[in-house]
A protein has these predicted regions:
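A short acidic (Asp/Glu
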Residues: 18-20, 44-46, 97-100, 139-146, ...
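Active-site-proximal specificity loops/subdomain of glycosyltransferases
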Residues: 36-89, 94-108
Length: 208
């Protein structure tokens, strides 16, 4: 099973070894787009030749933070692919898990993404959703399947009609979360987890 909505990975400065998230998607058989800056395009294109397409934002080293690349993914999903939603992920996610009976189980395909999409698509007021970090969910702690109205980082499923966009040079995940929480509810899954390097469950933002 693969995600219904397009998946994007933003990456910079990892062309030599390749983004971890892309390697995970190769193992899981998940198609994805890789968004990079112009000066690194050739390296990424050669290194990640299994990507659906390597996309390029307008300029290199613009100093505006990763929000510009995230917005470029958003525009591509909405205006080119005409998609209702899109996934956007950081490039340093080492693996994905599902939580069952408080046990983290490593996934073997994209079913966790499709399950998250199916859940979110039941509602008209979910603007942003995403997975939680696996290190917040230890085996012996009580967990609920999802959490509303909280911050979402690193792995996000975004409604393309959401009126708020990525902004700010730093902490753009937090800024988007706070912007969306003004009008929407957020949903974070606790059934699906992602394992991030140096930085899961499911979260959403919903409109009241």
């Amino acid at each position: 099973s693969v995600p219904r909505y397009p998946v994007y990975i933003i990456s910079k400065g990892r062309a030599q070894y390749g983004p971890l998230t892309a390697k995970v998607f190769q193992r899981l058989g998940i198609p994805f787009y890789l968004m990079v800056e112009p000066h690194e395009y050739n390296k990424y294109r050669t290194l990640c030749d299994w990507a659906t397409e390597v996309l390029v934002i307008g300029e290199s080293n613009h100093g505006m933070g990763p929000g510009r690349a995230r917005n470029a993914c958003w525009d591509h999903a909405k205006n080119v692919l005409k998609s209702k939603r899109h996934w956007v992920l950081d490039d340093n996610i080492a693996d994905f898990y599902r939580l069952h009976d408080n046990t983290r189980i490593r996934v073997g395909d994209g079913t966790v993404f499709r399950a998250a999409e199916d859940f979110v698509d039941r509602y008209k007021n979910v603007a942003v959703a995403g997975f939680a970090y696996n290190f917040f969910h230890v085996a012996k702690s009580k967990q609920y399947p999802f959490k509303l109205n909280t911050r979402i980082y690193s792995c996000l499923l975004i409604d393309n009609e959401c009126p708020y966009r990525w902004r700010g040079r730093y902490n753009e995940d937090t800024i988007l979360s706070l912007d969306v929480l003004k009008d929407f509810k957020k949903h974070k899954s606790h059934d699906q987890l992602n394992k991030k390097i140096s930085n899961g469950k499911f979260k959403t933002h919903q409109l009241d």
